[in-house]
């Protein structure tokens, strides 16, 4: 009897120890799972992280969109300013062209206008003595650019040219010894015309 009870007691104690070890191992496993679950990020945590990431991404996109809008507005303002500057320069160019054409017309009308002014002065002063008007006209004719002065200059050059041709012809023929013929100096009259030799024909105009 005592042997059977002792064996049962031993079996019971062994079984109790085995059961206790299995219970402790189960509790340790659950504790590990619980600790792991508490230390990690669950599906709720992952969903919250994704939402924050989306919010940051949306904020970045909104900032980029606002920057693009500001750049477009600045570009539009610059284009408007350039268009205004272009219109102003176009008007300035037209004004300068008109002034240039006006100055060119004035330059073309200058001789005629001066003649008209002189005619107007002569008509406004009919009582002026004839000698003064004649002297004034003679003075205009004696100007370097007047037709009378140009004609006198042309005649003088023609005389010099003919004398040079005659001298060259005589030297080529050998009929003229050196220093035999002296060229008479050109003499100018009071009116500015040169005195022609009687043997040299007058130039035709």
From Swiss-Prot:
Modified-residue entries (Phosphoserine), positions: 146
UniProt keyword annotation of RNA-binding present: no
Ranges of compositional bias, category Gly residues: 13-23, 34-48
Biased composition (Low complexity): 1-12
Biased composition (Basic and acidic residues): 24-33, 196-205
Residue ranges the record marks as coiled coil: 66-110
Record keyword Amino-acid biosynthesis present: no
Domain of life: Eukaryota
Family annotation (InterPro entries): CCDC89-like
Keywords assigned: Coiled coil, Phosphoprotein
Stretches the record annotates as Disordered: 1-49, 113-149, 174-205
Entry protein name: Tumor suppressor candidate gene 1 protein homolog
